[in-house]
Amino acid sequence: MWDLARRLAGRMAATGLAALLTRREDTCPTEAERAAFANAAGADLVLSLHVDANRSMHAQGLATFHFGNGSGITSTVGEALAGFIHRELTSRTAMLDLGTQARTWELLRLTRMPTVRVEIGYLTNLGDRRRLLDPAFRDVVAEGVLVGVKRLYLQGQDDQPTGTFTFSDVLARELAREETAPAISRRS
């Protein structure tokens, strides 16, 4: 996951988003420590990239999670973000769709901002593991997560079909926006 997180952080930085990683390659903070870090940093969003394991080698697939409990309390922005990311990833990968689900896990519960956990397959499944070992697949996942985040901020301008919005498209939009921003501020 470290390599995938670095790929995503690089793409985020290239499109004007600051990415703070809660761990280094040689560390593994608890979910409570990650939540405390995000809260102290004043992050706008938290993305947790994760792979799963199961006793059954047949368990496979992709799922996204946001905060929500059985009493109807949910993070509406987290739910929307999880949905955008999930749709982008399922349309770009051949992974089994396990859906978007609400949970009360520590990281989702303790953060003060929308938080999404992305479960990108099972290391115990040969097909999922093979995909995760492929750098090109990790690029596809990083692009899908980035586009999902950008779609959250493009609501009302969401005119491109799911799975077709690329890193190059996002970068071009950001560059075009930067070029028009000075012209707008000069008119003020």
Model-inferred region functions:
Residues 2-188:
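Active-site-proximal helix/loop segments of hydrolytic enzymes
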